[in-house]
């Protein structure tokens, strides 16, 4: 009797889809989309649109939202001067600044694995501010130059913090503590510039140091927008690279991921974004601290969602500036005063909760 053995049927192993994700097909390719993060992103987009319309409506003279929509859609309106020329440029600058701070905070906190690793806490914003204020006291006040000086100051401060914190790896707690030390030192340098400079220039620089959107127009909005558009490809890469950074170092090394270079690239992008935003509006404190952690809690994801963090940062800045304009009208408050009033208690809460990093935990392999 002859027995016939059947050849085993080879089957391609099915890809395991993580819980909470949906596979979205786009042409021949596909990608995973976190359902809750997508819903939160849509909700934040709607919220940002609503806050923006309210921002353009409320002022010395109230303009109905219907007229605001008419102006934004390009239709003729008697309120075109107030909405399109006076309020819209300032709102756009605030929106772009919030987007930049939101992404910058998310990237730096992801690399450091520490919710306190915010650009305005670890010295990056202070470095950008010190060089910018120093230039202002020596007569450089052109917005065509100040953002680039701000980027240079932020990158230099970040490089110093990175070098001093590196001990065979980037220890999260050491990174934050050394950054705080540099932030204090750089604030002292900024104060020195303010005391040695011309009185009127020092007064202007002091307002800028609190974080202010007062007087911002299209001359500031246009270069800021183009800079952020130029950084968009890097931001898309960062959204993909976040997953590799969150891996265990041994796992990433086994998969051949150049973890050190990826982390360095993410930090550099975060520093540039924070410095550009600082150059445009001054060091608006705590936006980069608040937005990533709130976005993560809203989406309940393992990594900080970049898009949600960016949108939330924009909502925070635009809404805070709306309150800053109207709370003590006709006197305007710097937007940084409002964000600090919310961010400082949140920072205290983080420290009390003990979320300053675990001993022995590092955030860097070989760089």
Labelled PLM ranges:
Residues 2-367:
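Alpha-helical transmembrane segments in inner-membrane proteins
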């Amino acid at each position: 009797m002859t027995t016939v053995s059947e050849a085993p049927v080879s089957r391609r192993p099915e890809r395991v889809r993580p819980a909470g994700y949906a596979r979205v097909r786009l042409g021949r390719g596909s990608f995973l989309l976190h359902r809750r993060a997508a819903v939160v992103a849509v909700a934040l987009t709607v919220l940002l649109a609503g806050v923006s319309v309210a921002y353009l409506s409320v002022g010395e003279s109230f303009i109905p939202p219907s007229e605001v929509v008419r102006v934004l859609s390009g239709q003729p309106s008697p309120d075109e001067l107030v909405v399109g020329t006076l309020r819209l440029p300032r709102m756009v600058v605030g929106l772009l600044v919030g987007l930049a701070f939101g992404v910058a905070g998310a990237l730096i906190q992801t690399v450091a694995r520490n919710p306190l690793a915010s650009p305005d806490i670890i010295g990056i914003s202070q470095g950008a501010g010190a060089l910018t204020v120093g230039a202002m006291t020596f007569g450089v006040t052109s917005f065509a130059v100040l953002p680039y000086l701000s980027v240079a100051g932020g990158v230099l401060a970040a490089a110093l913090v990175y070098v001093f914190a590196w001990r065979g790896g980037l220890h999260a707690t050491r990174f934050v503590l050394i950054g705080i030390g540099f932030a204090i030192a750089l604030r002292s340098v900024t104060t020195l510039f303010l005391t040695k400079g011309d009185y009127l220039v020092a007064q202007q620089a002091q307002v800028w140091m609190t974080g202010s959107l007062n007087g911002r127009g299209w001359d500031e909005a246009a270069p800021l927008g183009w800079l952020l558009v130029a950084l968009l490809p890097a931001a898309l890469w960062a959204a993909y690279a976040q997953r590799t950074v969150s891996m265990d170092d041994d796992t990433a090394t086994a998969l051949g991921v150049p973890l050190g270079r990826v982390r360095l690239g993410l930090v550099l992008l975060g520093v540039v974004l924070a410095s550009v935003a600082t150059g445009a509006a001054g060091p608006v404190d705590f936006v980069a601290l608040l937005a990533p952690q709130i976005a993560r809690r809203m989406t309940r994801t393992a990594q900080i969602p970049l898009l949600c963090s960016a949108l939330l940062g924009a909502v925070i800045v635009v809404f805070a500036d709306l309150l800053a304009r109207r709370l003590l009208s006709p006197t305007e408050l710097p937007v940084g005063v409002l964000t600090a009033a919310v961010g400082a208690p949140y920072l205290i809460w983080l420290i009390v909760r003990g979320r300053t990093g675990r001993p022995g935990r590092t955030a860097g392999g070989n760089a």
